[in-house]
């Protein structure tokens, strides 16, 4: 539980944008310790991000003070009759036109249509009362099918909701911790949301905490490079440099300072560059390290000793097939059909490779 809350706090502090309109709700969220309150304040923070994002895109002012429509008009110096208590998510008063914004998130078409009709009717019920005061109502209902917003990356949004859902495990009230509708909406969003980002796209969003030497290396690599050169220009430049070098070498302007070397000698010299290191690594040890350091490679290439089967089935192929089936059974790649096909291709490729190697051994 503490680890889940710590992960939520880390996401809130590091990956949700610093906006003054979110500061109050972020403080309320970060100040909670009980799972029930962390869950409620986390959902409020997520809803606040969506409301502000919708207000910004609609050109409205976010109603962070939870003002009613009547209070908004009174603060603007407009006398109006008594109005039903309606607290919009956003508003904007332009001359005699009042823009009211309502936003919501629903994952299923049925609940989306129901909520859209409810919000539309709620705003329409005060249209005639506002007309008496000379105010023209402009209602805006912003309905969304997901929780994406501009204040956090998509993978942070998904992870944040997933961690909030995990907090239900530590509560005895389960979905009664908050409204039942909120519980089902959270379940639907986690069930229907498919992360659109691949692993590399998500890695690119992470903060770059590398040292300055990386920038210096990239600057040295790109310094003096002309990006406007075509492939023919590059080939022509290389050929001209090589022709000049060849001509000067044949004419005697350049001394022949070449010597024959062996690959083994080069590797030995390279391994002895750092005198402080006492490790004597050879090629055999270096080739074994990648296999031994990877549990997956150890599982595939392991040599088992025990009772041998009478069949000619290749054990290495069977281990590979078993491993791929286990990966597919996890249902992690259900939305990546091409990657699933790649896993299927690995099985016949491995079998063909083993058959060829076995045939060569028999010959």
Swiss-Prot record:
Binding site for Mn(2+) 2: 89
One GO MF term attached to the UniProt entry: RNA-directed RNA polymerase activity
Protein's GO biological process: viral genome replication
Residue numbers spanned by region Endonuclease: 26-287
Keyword Heme: no
Cofactor(s) required, per the database record: Mn(2+); Mg(2+)
UniProt-listed Enzyme Commission number(s): 2.7.7.48, 3.1.-.-
Cofactor note: For endonuclease activity. Binds 2 Mn(2+) ions in the active site. The divalent metal ions are crucial for catalytic activity.
Pfam families referenced in this protein's UniProt entry, alphabetically: Arena_RNA_pol (PF06317), ArenaCapSnatch (PF17296)
Active site per UniProt: 115
Transmembrane segments: none
Enzymatic reactions: RNA(n) + a ribonucleoside 5'-triphosphate = RNA(n+1) + diphosphate
Binding-site residues, Mn(2+) 1: 51, 89, 102
InterPro entries for the chain: CapSnatch_arenavir (IPR026382), CapSnatch_bunyavir (IPR048006), RNA_pol_arenavir (IPR010453)
Claim: Calcium is one of the keywords in the record: no
GO cellular component annotations of the record: host cell cytoplasm; virion component
Annotated localization: Virion; Host cytoplasm
Keywords: Host cytoplasm, Hydrolase, Magnesium, Manganese, Metal-binding, Nucleotide-binding, Nucleotidyltransferase, RNA-directed RNA polymerase, Transferase, Viral RNA replication, Virion
Main subcellular localisation: virion
Function: RNA-dependent RNA polymerase, which is responsible for the replication and transcription of the viral RNA genome using antigenomic RNA as an intermediate. During transcription, synthesizes subgenomic RNAs and assures their capping by a cap-snatching mechanism, which involves the endonuclease activity cleaving the host capped pre-mRNAs. These short capped RNAs are then used as primers for viral transcription. The 3'-end of subgenomic mRNAs molecules are heterogeneous and not polyadenylated.
Assembly with partners or alone: Homomultimer; the oligomeric structure is essential for the polymerase activity. Interacts with nucleoprotein N. Interacts with protein Z; this interaction inhibits viral transcription and replication, Z partially blocks the product exit tunnel for the releasing nascent RNA product.
Family statement drawn from the similarity comment of this UniProt entry: Belongs to the Arenaviridae RNA polymerase family.
Other observations noted: Classified as His(-) endonuclease since it does not have a histidine upstream of the active site that coordinates the first cation. His(-) endonucleases display very low activity in vitro, although they are clearly active in vivo.
Domain notes: The N-terminus contains the endonuclease activity (endoN). The central region contains the RdRp activity.
Record-given protein name: RNA-directed RNA polymerase L
Organism annotation: Lymphocytic choriomeningitis virus (strain WE)
């Amino acid at each position: 539980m503490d680890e889940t809350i710590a992960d939520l706090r880390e996401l809130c502090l590091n990956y949700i944008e610093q906006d003054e309109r979110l500061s109050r709700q972020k403080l309320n969220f970060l100040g909670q310790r009980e799972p029930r309150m962390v869950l409620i304040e986390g959902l409020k923070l997520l809803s606040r991000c969506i409301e502000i994002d919708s207000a910004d895109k609609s050109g409205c002012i976010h109603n962070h003070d939870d003002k009613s429509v009547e209070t908004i008009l009174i603060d603007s110096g407009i006398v109006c009759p008594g109005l039903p208590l309606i607290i919009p998510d956003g508003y904007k008063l332009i001359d005699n036109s009042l823009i009211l914004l309502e936003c919501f998130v629903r994952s299923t078409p049925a609940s989306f249509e129901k909520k859209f009709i409810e919000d539309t009717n709620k705003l329409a019920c005060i249209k005639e009362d506002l007309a008496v005061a000379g105010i023209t109502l402009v209602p805006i209902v912003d309905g969304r099918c997901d929780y994406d917003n501009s204040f956090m990356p998509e993978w942070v949004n998904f992870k944040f909701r997933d961690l909030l859902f995990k907090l239900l495990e530590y509560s005895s009230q389960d979905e009664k911790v908050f409204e039942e509708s909120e519980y089902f909406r959270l379940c639907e969003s986690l069930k229907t949301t498919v992360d659109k980002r691949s692993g590399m796209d998500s890695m690119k969003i992470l903060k770059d905490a590398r040292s300055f030497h990386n920038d210096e290396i990239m600057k040295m690599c790109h310094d003096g490079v002309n990006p406007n050169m075509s492939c023919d220009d590059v080939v022509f430049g290389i050929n001209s440099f090589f022709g000049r070098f060849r001509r000067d070498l044949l004419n005697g302007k350049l001394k022949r300072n070449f010597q024959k070397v062996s690959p083994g000698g080069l590797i030995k010299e390279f391994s002895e560059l750092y005198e402080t290191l006492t490790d004597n690594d050879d090629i055999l040890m270096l080739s074994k390290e990648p296999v031994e350091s990877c549990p997956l490679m150890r599982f595939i290439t392991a040599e088992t000793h025990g009772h041998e089967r009478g069949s000619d089935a290749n054990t290495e192929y069977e281990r590979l097939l078993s491993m791929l089936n286990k990966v597919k059974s996890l249902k992690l790649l259900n939305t990546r059909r091409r990657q699933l096909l790649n896993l299927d291709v690995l099985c016949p490729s491995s079998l063909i490779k083993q058959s060829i190697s076995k045939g060569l051994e028999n010959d």
